[in-house]
Every structure is written in structure tokens, then in C-alpha cells.
């Protein structure tokens, strides 16, 4: 790898907070030792003058959201970034902007999860029913909720899946609680999961599963409980100690996540969106043992992932050698967006024709302590050694395009 990477140039744009949190300078130093030049990009200046660039790593989520609010400076930055991408299709972007936009919208990402679950037809996976509320709750809201397969209690989240406010959530137990809901938002069925959340941190074909505390169990059906408002970031911190996470007793089944299921979900999302750096929040239904994806995050914090920098550099090497499946989809993604009349720019779904594992064998489970709320469960490589059915692409594109055209 070292010989191949020598002389390559990797540009990155991250907020100063993200750089400090990740200690990204350590990654830059690791790259330099491998002969890779790392360039911190200044988007206020022409990117052309800062090139050439073989790969660009970014987290432009804040800038994209501000641009969507018509902030003139952010609009200019996003436009400059997009113009460089258009002028340099040979540059690998981690990750493509259309995919980031999908992950920034919980309604769209949940719909994608639903379509993937429908395609996979794996009984070990369930997609929690959800719906988007775009206006204040009225007399017909309860009917709509029932029509969409939701039942009390359910969890209410902001539609935007990024930023401080995105962690502010509520558990609604009855019709009275609907009065406090502030649209636009997304409501999602609450699934009892014995107060355990599994955060899956994905880097290309590698992933790490970290165990975190989560919400305790609640009785199914309508109750007279008052709505519970909470910050999910605080609840699921490694060191979190909250009455909301204090489990009276383990109910139903208590299972660890199935490695095969995690691998298949991660692979499906990579293929559907063409993304490399993302996080998946998974809970295990304590009645059925099914895995439920309750959130997806673009370029998460990777807390507890000790090998993040090594995985990232390995992935960069793989994409530059054309061995990472998601990267081969970028040009096809653009074509699909054009073919669907532009509306698919935020709903792109494309599949690989196959992928090659270059990372080696899967490593074993590592459980440091059953009482530790932040336990690293595993560090795995996604070994994809079989072709993916072309119908996967057709299924996702057709269903999402149909939904998009109906809105």
C-alpha cells in the first residue's frame, strides 16, 4: 500500500471542532508517513488553486444546511465545492453530496431503510413504522398515525438529522401528548430494546460496533403518562446515568447483534447511497430479537473506534485502486439523478456489481465488561465476495423515484 499511495494528495474540509474532536492532525501525520500529502482545504478560495486532489474528505453538513436556508456565504461555498467536483470527476469524494443530503433528512433516510428492508426480506431485520408530520396535529392526525402503522408510544424527532437540535426528542404516550409536537418532524414507533443501543461506525468495508445505554422499556399502547422530552446525545453517552436508561428488569429476549445482519445492513446502505463514512444506530427488539435501524448519521464522531485512522487510510487506498464498491457508483449516481428528472438528487439509490475484500479476515468479538455502558463489541471487515443482484438497484431507484414523483 505504501508504494501505491506515495505522491497521492488528499484534501479535507472539516469544522475546527471536528478536527479537534477526531484529532485529525494525527491522521494527517499517518498519511505523511505513507507518502500521502494531506491538504486542509479553504473553501473561501478557489479549490482549483489548492489541487490537484486525488481524494476529498469532508463533513459539509452544517454548510449544506445553512445553504438550504439561503445563507449567501454557505451557498457560495457549496457551489464552489460542487463546481470543483463537476470539473474533476476523477477526484474521489468521501462522501457524495446527494447522499449527504439524504442522510440529513430523517424522512428520506427512513424511507430508504424501509425500501432496503423490503428488498432484503430478512426476518432478522425490521423497519420501525414512521411518518412525517408537516403541519400542526389536527383531528385527523390520529387516523393518519394508525394508517401508517404507528401505535403509542412513539418517538418524535426533528426532520433534520444533524446539529444540536437533532438530538432533542420526545416520547409521546397518548393523544394529549400530540399537542406538544412541533412540525416539521418525524415520528417513529418506539420499540422496547432493554435499554441498549448499538452504534455501528462504518469506514468503507470496515465497521466497529460499540454498545451504549439507551431508553428503558415502556408498556405498549396508550397510557396516561406525560410526554418525556430528552436529549438523545446525553442519554446515549458512554458514561450516561439517567432515570430514562435505568432498566427495572430485562424483559423478553436479550440478544447481542448478529454480525451477519450488521454486515448486510452496512453493505446495503453503502451500495444504496455510495457512502463510506457513516454511523448506524441499531436496537434489538426485545420481543422478536429483530434488528431495527433507528437512525443513520453522516460522518459520525467514531468514539470508541481505536483503529479509525488506519481504517480510513486503508479505505482511501482501496478507493484509489478502484476496489471499493461504492466509489464506482458516483458517476452512475449522477446519471440516475438526471434520468429521474432531478428530483432524485436527494434520493439516489444505486448498487454495485460486486466488490472485493482487501482488508483480511474478520476479527473476533471483544467484550470488555458487561457492566460497562460503552463496550466495543467488534471490529469487522465487510467481506463482500459475491455479486450483488442488479435488481437491487432497479428496486431502490424505482420505488424511491415513484415516491418522489408523487410528492
UniProtKB/Swiss-Prot annotation:
Tell me which residues bind ATP: 106, 157, 188-199, 214, 232, 236
**Sequence positions that bind Mg(2+) 2:** 295, 297
User: Which positions are annotated as binding 1D-myo-inositol 1,3,4-trisphosphate?
Assistant: 18, 167, 199, 297
The coenzyme or cofactor needed here is: Mg(2+)
Kindly report, in one word, the top-level EC class recorded for this enzyme. Answer: transferase
| Catalytic reactions of this protein | 1D-myo-inositol 3,4,5,6-tetrakisphosphate + ATP = 1D-myo-inositol 1,3,4,5,6-pentakisphosphate + ADP + H(+); 1D-myo-inositol 1,3,4-trisphosphate + ATP = 1D-myo-inositol 1,3,4,5-tetrakisphosphate + ADP + H(+); 1D-myo-inositol 1,3,4-trisphosphate + ATP = 1D-myo-inositol 1,3,4,6-tetrakisphosphate + ADP + H(+); 1D-myo-inositol 3,4,6-trisphosphate + ATP = 1D-myo-inositol 1,3,4,6-tetrakisphosphate + ADP + H(+)
Q: What positions does the entry give for Mg(2+) 1 binding?
A: 281, 295
Q: Which domain of life is it from?
A: Eukaryota
Q: Does the record bear 4Fe-4S in its keywords?
A: no
GO MF terms held by the record: ATP binding; inositol-1,3,4,5-tetrakisphosphate 6-kinase activity; inositol-1,3,4-trisphosphate 5-kinase activity; inositol-1,3,4-trisphosphate 6-kinase activity; inositol-3,4,5,6-tetrakisphosphate 1-kinase activity; inositol-3,4,6-trisphosphate 1-kinase activity; isomerase activity; magnesium ion binding
Alphabetized UniProt keyword annotations:
ATP-binding, Isomerase, Kinase, Magnesium, Metal-binding, Nucleotide-binding, Transferase
GO term, biological process aspect, one: necroptotic process
Cofactor, free-text remark: Binds 2 magnesium ions per subunit.
Q: Which residues form the ATP-grasp domain?
A: 117-341
Entry EC no(s): 2.7.1.134, 2.7.1.159
This protein's record includes keyword Kinase:
yes
What function is annotated for this protein?
Kinase that can phosphorylate various inositol polyphosphate such as Ins(3,4,5,6)P4 or Ins(1,3,4)P3. Phosphorylates Ins(3,4,5,6)P4 at position 1 to form Ins(1,3,4,5,6)P5. This reaction is thought to have regulatory importance, since Ins(3,4,5,6)P4 is an inhibitor of plasma membrane Ca(2+)-activated Cl(-) channels, while Ins(1,3,4,5,6)P5 is not. Also phosphorylates Ins(1,3,4)P3 on O-5 and O-6 to form Ins(1,3,4,6)P4, an essential molecule in the hexakisphosphate (InsP6) pathway.
How this chain assembles, per its entry, is: Monomer.
Name the family the entry cites. Answer: Belongs to the ITPK1 family.
Protein name (database record)? Inositol-tetrakisphosphate 1-kinase
**Organism for this UniProt entry:** Gallus gallus (Chicken)
Coding gene?
A: ITPK1
Amino acid at each position: 500500500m505504501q508504494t501505491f499511495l506515495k505522491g497521492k494528495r488528499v484534501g479535507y474540509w472539516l469544522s475546527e471542532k471536528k478536527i479537534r474532536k477526531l484529532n485529525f492532525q494525527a491522521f494527517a501525520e499517518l498519511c505523511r508517513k505513507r507518502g500521502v500529502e494531506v491538504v486542509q482545504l479553504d473553501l473561501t478560495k478557489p479549490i482549483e488553486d489548492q489541487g490537484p486532489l486525488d481524494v476529498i474528505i469532508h463533513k459539509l453538513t452544517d454548510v449544506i444546511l445553512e445553504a438550504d436556508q439561503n445563507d449567501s456565504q454557505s451557498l457560495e461555498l457549496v457551489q464552489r465545492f460542487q463546481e470543483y467536483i463537476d470539473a474533476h470527476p476523477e477526484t474521489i469524494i468521501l462522501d457524495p453530496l446527494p447522499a449527504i443530503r439524504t442522510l440529513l433528512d430523517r424522512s428520506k433516510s427512513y424511507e430508504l431503510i424501509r425500501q432496503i428492508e423490503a428488498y432484503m426480506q430478512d426476518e432478522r431485520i425490521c423497519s420501525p413504522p414512521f411518518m412525517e408530520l408537516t403541519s400542526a396535529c389536527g383531528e385527523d392526525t390520529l387516523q393518519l398515525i394508525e394508517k401508517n402503522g404507528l401505535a403509542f408510544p412513539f418517538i418524535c424527532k426533528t426532520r433534520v438529522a444533524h446539529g444540536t437540535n437533532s438530538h432533542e426528542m420526545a416520547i409521546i404516550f397518548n393523544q394529549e401528548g400530540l399537542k406538544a409536537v412541533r412540525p416539521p418532524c418525524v415520528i417513529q414507533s418506539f420499540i422496547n430494546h432493554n435499554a441498549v443501543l448499538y452504534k455501528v461506525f462504518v469506514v468503507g468495508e470496515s465497521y466497529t460496533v460499540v454498545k451504549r445505554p439507551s431508553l428503558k422499556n415502556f408498556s405498549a399502547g396508550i397510557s396516561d403518562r406525560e410526554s418525556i422530552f430528552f436529549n438523545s446525545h446525553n442519554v446515549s453517552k458512554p458514561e450516561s446515568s439517567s432515570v430514562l436508561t435505568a432498566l427495572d428488569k430485562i424483559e423478553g429476549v436479550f440478544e447481542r447483534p448478529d454480525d451477519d445482519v450488521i454486515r448486510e445492513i452496512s453493505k446495503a446502505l453503502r451500495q444504496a447511497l455510495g457512502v463510506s463514512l457513516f454511523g448506524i444506530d441499531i436496537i434489538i427488539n426485545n420481543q422478536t430479537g429483530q434488528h431495527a435501524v433507528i437512525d443513520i448519521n453522516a460522518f459520525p464522531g467514531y468514539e470508541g473506534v481505536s483503529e479509525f485512522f488506519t481504517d480510513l487510510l486503508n479505505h482511501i487506498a482501496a478507493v484509489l485502486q478502484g476496489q471499493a464498491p461504492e466509489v464506482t457508483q458516483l458517476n452512475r449516481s449522477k446519471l440516475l439523478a438526471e434520468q429521474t428528472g432531478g428530483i432524485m438528487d436527494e434520493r439516489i439509490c444505486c448498487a454495485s456489481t460486486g466488490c472485493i475484500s482487501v482488508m483480511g479476515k474478520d476479527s473476533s468479538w471483544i467484550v470488555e465488561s458487561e457492566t460497562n455502558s460503552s463496550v466495543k463489541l467488534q471490529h469487522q471487515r465487510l467481506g463482500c465476495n459475491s455479486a450483488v443482484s442488479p435488481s437491487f438497484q432497479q428496486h431502490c431507484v424505482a420505488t424511491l423515484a415513484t415516491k418522489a414523483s408523487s410528492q
